[in-house]
Design a protein with these regions (language model features):
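Catalytic-loop of the protein kinase fold
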Residues: 133-150
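Conserved hydrophobic alpha-helix
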Residues: 125-132
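Conserved structural core of kinase catalytic domains
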Residues: 61-118
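Conserved N-terminal boundary motif of the eukaryotic protein kinase catalytic domain
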Residues: 1-7
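ATP-binding glycine-rich loop module of kinase domains
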Residues: 10-83
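Conserved C-terminal C-lobe helix
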Residues: 303-304
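C-lobe/activation-segment region of protein kinase-like
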Residues: 155, 159-297
Length: 304
C-alpha cells in the first residue's frame, strides 16, 4: 500500500508529491504539494528563499507560496507491498532517516507538459519579474519546467539558484555560468571567460584588442550561436536573428567592449553588472515565450 502521495516529479535535489507525504507524528496529510529535499542544506536554503518570497508575494500572484514545513520519515514514501522507493533521491538511506518536506500551496503543471499555451498569461510573469527586481531578486533559472500553469495564470517556481541582483555575477558562480544553456544570456559566458583570463600575465591583459578578440572567440567556439540554429528561420521572421553576423553577434561584441574596452572603476563596474543582471531573467523569459509560441499553430498572428 502506498503510504506517500502521488509522485509528480523528481529532480536533482528531491521529489515533489501530491498530496504531501504525511508528516512525522501527524495522523493526516496536510493539503498542498510536498517537496522532499534530499540534503538538509539545500532544504534550509529553499526554506529561506520561500520565506522571502512569501513576504513580497503573500497572495501567490507570481509564485507558488510556501505554506509550511515538516519532518518526514523515509518509510512514509515507500510502497510496502513491493518495498519500492518512490523517490529515487532517498533510495540509499535507511527507513529511519528524516527529511525536510516543504509544502507549497498550488499543484498545477509546468509549461513543459502543459497542453495549451495562453500568451496573455505571460504578462503576469512579466509583472512578477518587475516585483523581483523591485526587491533586488534574480531568479536565474527561468525555463519551461520552472513555470507553473495554474489554469488562470502562470507563476514562477524553483528558486534554488536565485540570488540578489548584485550577486548574479560572482566569482564563485563563474563555472556554472559557462553552461551552454539557451536560457542563459551571453553575458554569463563572457563574465565566466573573463575570470578565466584573469589568470594570464599583465602584458596580455593590457592588450585590450587581443583580450576582446580572445573572449569573443571563446564565446563563438562554445557553440553559443549554434544553439539558435534550429530556430533561425523563426527568429529571422520576428527580427531577432538576422544572420550569423547579425544581432546576437553584435550584441556580444558590444558587451565585451563595454566591460573590457573601458577603464571602469570597481564601483562603476559593479553598477554595470547589476544593470546586466536586471536583464538576465527578462532574457530567459523571452526565450521561453519564443520557444512556446513561435511554432504553435493554434495561436493567431496577433497573439504571437
Amino acid at each position: 500500500m502506498n503510504r506517500g502521495g502521488e509522485l509528480l516529479g523528481e529532480g536533482n535535489y528531491g521529489c515533489v508529491f501530491h498530496p504531501p507525504i504525511r508528516c512525522d507524528n501527524e495522523k493526516r496529510r496536510r493539503s498542498g504539494v510536498g517537496k522532499v529535499v534530499q540534503r538538509l542544506e539545500d532544504a534550509l536554503d529553499e526554506i529561506k528563499i520561500g520565506k522571502k518570497l512569501f513576504k513580497i508575494d503573500p497572495k501567490g500572484k507570481f509564485t507558488n507560496p510556501m505554506m509550511s514545513t515538516c519532518t518526514i520519515k523515509k518509510k512514509n514514501i515507500t510502497q510496502k507491498d513491493e518495498e519500492k522507493i518512490i523517490c529515487g533521491a532517498t533510495s540509499t538511506l535507511n527507513n529511519n532517516t528524516s527529511y525536510k518536506q516543504i509544502i507549497y500551496k498550488y499543484k498545477g503543471v509546468d509549461l513543459s507538459v502543459s497542453e495549451s499555451i495562453q500568451v496573455k498569461h505571460f504578462y503576469n510573469l512579466a509583472l512578477g519579474l518587475k516585483l523581483f527586481q523591485e526587491n533586488n531578486l534574480c531568479h536565474r533559472d527561468i525555463k519551461e519546467e520552472n513555470i507553473l500553469d495554474l489554469g488562470k495564470r502562470y507563476v514562477f517556481i524553483d528558486f534554488g539558484l536565485s540570488c540578489k541582483l548584485d550577486e548574479v555575477y560572482s566569482m564563485e558562480d563563474s563555472s556554472w555560468l559557462l553552461h551552454p544553456y539557451i536560457y542563459y544570456p551571453p553575458e554569463f559566458k563572457i563574465y565566466a571567460m573573463m575570470n578565466d583570463l584573469l589568470e594570464l600575465d599583465d602584458e596580455y591583459l593590457n592588450n585590450t584588442e587581443e583580450l576582446v578578440d580572445d573572449i569573443f572567440q571563446q564565446v563563438e567556439d562554445s557553440g553559443y550561436f549554434d544553439q539558435y540554429a534550429q530556430y533561425k528561420a523563426d527568429l529571422k521572421d520576428v527580427g531577432v536573428y538576422k544572420n550569423r553576423r547579425g544581432d546576437i553577434y553584435n550584441a556580444i561584441h558590444t558587451i565585451v567592449n563595454d566591460t573590457i574596452g573601458t577603464n571602469m572603476s570597481s564601483a562603476n563596474m559593479k553598477k554595470y553588472y547589476k544593470k546586466l543582471a536586471m536583464k538576465a531573467d527578462v532574457f530567459s523569459l523571452g526565450i521561453v515565450m519564443f520557444l512556446m509560441t513561435a511554432n504553435n499553430e493554434e495561436l493567431s498572428l496577433n497573439e504571437k
